[in-house]
Structures are given as C-alpha cells and as structure tokens.
Amino acid sequence: MISFSLLLLISLLTCAGQLCQKQAVMCWRSDVYQRASALKWLIGAVILLAVGMLFWLRLLQILPLGIAYPMLSINFIMVTLAGKFFYQEKAGIKHWSGVVFIMLGILLMSLNE
C-alpha cells in the first residue's frame, strides 16, 4: 500500500511539474513583461520534478525497477487529462484508446503485486 501511495505522489509531482513547464512556455510566448513570470514557473517545475525524483529513488528501494517504471505510465493519463481540462487540448480517439490500454496495463501489473 505504501508503494502505491508513493507512486501516486510521484505521478502527481511529475504531472504538476509538466504543467508548470507548459505554463512557462505559454508565458514566454506572451509579451516581454510576462517573461519574468515564465522563470517562476520554470523554477516551480524544477522543484516539483526534483522532489518527485527524490521520492522515486525511495520507491526504487521498495519495488523492483521492472514493476515501478511501467507503473509510472500513470503520468501519461494524468498529463493527458490535465492538458484537456487546463489547456483545452484535443486528443483523438487513438490517443484515448492508448490511455485506456495504459490503464489496463497498470491494472494488470497491480494485480500481480
């Protein structure tokens, strides 16, 4: 149970870091005055991703790499959903089908655990 909680925390931190990167790029494309805020978003991204990596190293002490790394694919699901809800990004049927297959794979791996 602790490994699943840790994996979920890592995924949330990584997803948040990716969203900060996206926000930084969007600020950078704006006018010159908003470029300073892009740096703040980038710093936030680095911090979130670094903390996620520290928890990842802890998770690798608990789970084998062959189990932990594929289960990290939950990030694809989180980032896809976040892109849709926060940035109104479009994803086609093939993309959503891939997300469903990832979810099935994660389910199968967690049943083996």
Curated annotation (Swiss-Prot):
Key words, A-Z: Cell inner membrane, Cell membrane, Lipid A biosynthesis, Lipid biosynthesis, Lipid metabolism, Lipopolysaccharide biosynthesis, Membrane, Transmembrane, Transmembrane helix, Transport
Subcellular location(s) per record: Cell inner membrane
GO aspect biological process, one term: lipopolysaccharide biosynthetic process
Disulfide bridge partners, by residue number: none
Pathway assigned to this chain's UniProt record: Bacterial outer membrane biogenesis; lipopolysaccharide biosynthesis
The family this protein is said to belong to: Belongs to the ArnE family.
Gene: arnE
One GO location term (cellular component): plasma membrane
Cell inner membrane as UniProt keyword: yes
Function (record text): Translocates 4-amino-4-deoxy-L-arabinose-phosphoundecaprenol (alpha-L-Ara4N-phosphoundecaprenol) from the cytoplasmic to the periplasmic side of the inner membrane.
Name assigned to this protein: Probable 4-amino-4-deoxy-L-arabinose-phosphoundecaprenol flippase subunit ArnE
